[in-house]
Design a protein with these regions (language model features):
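Short, small-residue-biased leader/transition segments that mark boundaries at the very start
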Residues: 1-5
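Active-site loop-to-helix "anion-binding N-cap" substructures in soluble metabolic enzymes
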Residues: 13-276
Length: 276
């Protein structure tokens, strides 16, 4: 009976620690529009999100990441609101003869606050490596942008049981190079690449398992600061599954793809956080 009592007390203590850590982290819903919408459509989408934002608790931080061509219009549409704007990528260099590139300084000058770096599509289609991403991270920080750094394994890596190793490498080769001050400004997003467009589904338990592992890796390098780092789920997050995902201890929000293109769905996802 004594052992049972001790276990119950410990369970209560762990639950209190979980609630404290979970509640002190930012709740973030970030929309990655990818290569979708035309500029006027993007502005209309931003205006719709803004018009209905008050339906969701002010404790939820909304970020929209439209294509480069939309940034000026979207930033203007969201001016004086609490909805932040981010870019989907930035150059690894600060300026010069890099045709087609957009620098972090340019993004910051427009009014961007965030930038997505290391997205699985950038890694897969454009061959982005840790070496490139280290340079992009440096550019982001040098210009006052907060990176949303993406990690995740593909189907082959998941089925081979290498998912922990892949994510660990992606963290160690880039995030471990940050100073404590830079780390404090970083958001992590986990993308289960194997569950995106494959017909396979990542469960909330699978999401929590890898999110907890990511936080453990971060804690090994940065200590207690890792408990304050938001870790977003970048799988197929929708209004229907957001509550189950966001209830998990180490899931602090979502990096949203398709559902971010409809204002109602995007905002509904923000309602998925547990109530205190």
């Amino acid at each position: 009976a004594s052992d049972v009592y001790k276990r119950q007390v410990l369970a209560c203590i762990y639950r209190l620690i979980y609630l404290k850590n979970k509640n002190m982290r930012k709740k973030i819903v970030a929309g990655n529009w990818k290569m979708n919408t035309l500029p006027a459509e993007g502005v209309e989408l931003a205006e719709n999100i803004r018009a209905n934002r008050n339906q969701v608790c002010s404790c939820v931080n909304f970020i929209v990441c439209p294509p480069f061509t939309h940034l000026g219009g979207v930033i203007e549409a969201l001016r004086s609101s609490d909805i932040e704007v981010g870019a989907q990528n930035c150059a690894a260099e600060d300026k010069g003869a890099y045709t087609g590139e957009v620098s972090a300084a340019m993004l910051a000058a427009l009014g961007c606050r965030y930038v997505i770096l290391g997205h699985s599509e950038r890694r897969q289609y454009y061959g982005e490596t840790s070496a490139t991403l280290n340079k992009k991270m440096a550019q982001a920080f040098a210009n006052g942008l907060q990176p949303i750094y993406c990690v995740g394994e593909n189907l082959e890596e998941r089925e081979a049981g290498r998912h922990f190793d892949v994510v660990k490498t992606q963290i160690e080769e880039v995030i471990y190079n940050l100073t404590p001050a830079q780390f404090a400004r970083t958001v992590i997003a986990y993308e289960p690449v194997w569950a995106i467009g494959t017909g396979k589904t990542a469960t909330a338990e699978q999401a929590q398992e890898i999110h907890a592992y990511i936080r453990t890796i971060l804690r090994e390098k940065f200590g207690a600061a890792a408990d304050e780092t938001p870790i977003l789920y970048g799988g197929s997050c929708k209004p229907s599954n957001a509550p189950e995902l966001f209830a998990k201890e180490d899931v602090d929000g979502g990096l949203i793809g398709g559902a971010a293109l409809k204002a109602a769905d995007f905002l509904a996802i923000g309602k998925g956080f547990p109530q205190k």
